[in-house]
């Protein structure tokens, strides 16, 4: 159901469904990843407030702790670039560190394209 809401760009409903799934599947990294994607609400990270960004990063970090995957690090790199770098805010790790991790864990172009497709945000060249 959560994926249907996400495909229909019903981000609040999708987030609620993924949040409920986290309770029942707390060891499934993808649930945390997609919950974080929902918080973007189809808008660039740059346009969100810091509290929303922090929640996204919390969910991505949870996904990484369960199963480190390249696309999770890429999502983190996207946030670190589009929010922190564009607002001239220093953060550790920075987007370059996250990109390095994404490549270390393997992040094929198909995963990156899928991220941008489900997130509903324009593709950003952060390399």
What are these regions, as identified by a protein language model?
Residues 86, 90-127:
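Terminal, low-structured helical/coil segments at or just beyond the last alpha-helical repeat
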């Amino acid at each position: 159901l959560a994926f249907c809401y996400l495909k229909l760009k019903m981000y609040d409903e999708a987030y609620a469904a993924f949040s409920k799934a986290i309770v029942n599947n707390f060891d499934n990294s993808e649930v945390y990843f997609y919950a974080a994607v929902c918080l973007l609400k189809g808008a660039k990270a740059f346009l969100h407030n810091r509290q929303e960004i922090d929640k996204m990063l919390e969910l991505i970090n949870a996904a990484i702790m369960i199963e480190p995957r390249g696309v999770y690090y890429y999502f983190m790199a996207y946030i670190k670039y589009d929010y922190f770098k564009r607002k001239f805010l220093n953060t550790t790790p920075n987007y370059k560190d996250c990109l390095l991790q994404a490549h270390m864990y393997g992040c094929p172009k198909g995963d990156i394209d899928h991220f941008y497709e489900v997130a509903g945000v324009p593709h950003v060249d952060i390399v």
